[in-house]
């Protein structure tokens, strides 16, 4: 009896008939095994690129760390100028009001508060704005000089005027103003000292311009380095 082209009891090799796909199957298995043993090109590329990516990230972190250190030093310098302006204004208004009480307290507050206000304002409105909004160079310089005027001159002057005016009223070191003319009386009394505050005003504008130029130069330098490394 013949079943599927060969007799019963005979093997396919003996009859000379080879089933379709019997010789191709071992070749396919061998190719699959060889491909399975070798790593794919994408994995090799990933292994080669990984050290390069890590090196670029480390360099970028180094650039950002150096940039942060430079900005912190610059903010501290700018805040120190505001602190000296506060000390100068406190000295002038204490002489104006002839106050000799609480010297350490007033000098400490007039040195610390302008310093902190300048550092915080410079961080928020110059550095953070420079990296988030990408403001222009002119805008950066304008903001920095405005911070120098407000936090380095107007704020310490008003603070020294208020603190020493209260001490003068408390200890009666100067004649009290008449009713209804308090502000005019104090302004007339401190007219000379207010004119002398033009000295720190000029310095704070100058330091503000230099501060803005410095922050923008550091930002541009770091940006160029990171783009070049990428």
From Swiss-Prot:
<comment type="function">
    <text>As part of the MCIA complex, involved in the assembly of the mitochondrial complex I. Participates in constructing the membrane arm of complex I.</text>
</comment>
<keyword id="KW-0597">Phosphoprotein</keyword>
<keyword id="KW-0496">Mitochondrion</keyword>
<keyword id="KW-1133">Transmembrane helix</keyword>
<comment type="similarity">
    <text>Belongs to the TMEM126 family.</text>
</comment>
<dbReference type="GO" id="GO:0005743">
    <property type="term" value="C:mitochondrial inner membrane"/>
</dbReference>
<dbReference type="Pfam" id="PF07114">
    <property type="entry name" value="TMEM126"/>
</dbReference>
<keyword id="KW-0812">Transmembrane</keyword>
<feature type="transmembrane region" description="Helical">
    <location>
        <begin position="141"/>
        <end position="161"/>
    </location>
</feature>
<keyword id="KW-0472">Membrane</keyword>
<keyword id="KW-1274">Primary mitochondrial disease</keyword>
<dbReference type="InterPro" id="IPR009801">
    <property type="entry name" value="TMEM126"/>
</dbReference>
<dbReference type="GO" id="GO:0032094">
    <property type="term" value="P:response to food"/>
</dbReference>
<feature type="transmembrane region" description="Helical">
    <location>
        <begin position="72"/>
        <end position="92"/>
    </location>
</feature>
<keyword id="KW-0143">Chaperone</keyword>
<feature type="transmembrane region" description="Helical">
    <location>
        <begin position="110"/>
        <end position="130"/>
    </location>
</feature>
<protein>
    <recommendedName>
        <fullName>Complex I assembly factor TMEM126B, mitochondrial</fullName>
    </recommendedName>
</protein>
<dbReference type="GO" id="GO:0032981">
    <property type="term" value="P:mitochondrial respiratory chain complex I assembly"/>
</dbReference>
<comment type="subunit">
    <text>Part of the mitochondrial complex I assembly/MCIA complex that comprises at least the core subunits TMEM126B, NDUFAF1, ECSIT and ACAD9 and complement subunits such as COA1 and TMEM186. Associates with the intermediate 370 kDa subcomplex of incompletely assembled complex I. Interacts with TMEM70.</text>
</comment>
<dbReference type="GO" id="GO:0005739">
    <property type="term" value="C:mitochondrion"/>
</dbReference>
<keyword id="KW-0225">Disease variant</keyword>
<feature type="modified residue" description="Phosphoserine">
    <location>
        <position position="34"/>
    </location>
</feature>
<feature type="transmembrane region" description="Helical">
    <location>
        <begin position="199"/>
        <end position="219"/>
    </location>
</feature>
């Amino acid at each position: 009896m013949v079943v599927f082209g060969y007799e019963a009891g005979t093997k396919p090799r003996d009859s000379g008939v080879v089933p379709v796909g019997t010789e191709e199957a071992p070749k396919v298995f061998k190719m699959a095994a060889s491909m399975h043993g070798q790593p794919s090109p994408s994995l090799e590329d990933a292994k080669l690129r990984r050290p390069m990516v890590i090196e670029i990230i480390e360099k970028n972190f180094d650039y950002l760390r150096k940039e942060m250190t430079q900005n912190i030093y610059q903010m501290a310098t700018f805040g120190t100028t505001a602190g000296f302006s506060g000390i100068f204004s406190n000295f002038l208004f204490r002489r104006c009001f002839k106050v000799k009480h609480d010297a350490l307290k007033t000098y400490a507050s007039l040195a610390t508060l302008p310093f902190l206000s300048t550092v915080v304002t410079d961080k928020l409105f110059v550095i953070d704005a420079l990296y988030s909004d990408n403001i222009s160079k002119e805008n950066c310089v304008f903001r920095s000089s405005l911070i120098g005027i407000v936090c380095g001159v107007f704020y310490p002057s008003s603070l020294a005027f208020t603190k020493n005016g209260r001490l003068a009223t408390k200890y009666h070191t100067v004649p009290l103003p008449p009713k209804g003319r308090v502000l005019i009386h104090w302004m007339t009394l401190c007219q000379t000292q207010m004119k002398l505050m033009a000295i720190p005003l000029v310095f704070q504008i100058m330091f503000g311009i230099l501060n803005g130029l410095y922050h923008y130069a550091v930002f541009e330098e770091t940006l160029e380095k990171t783009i070049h490394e990428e």
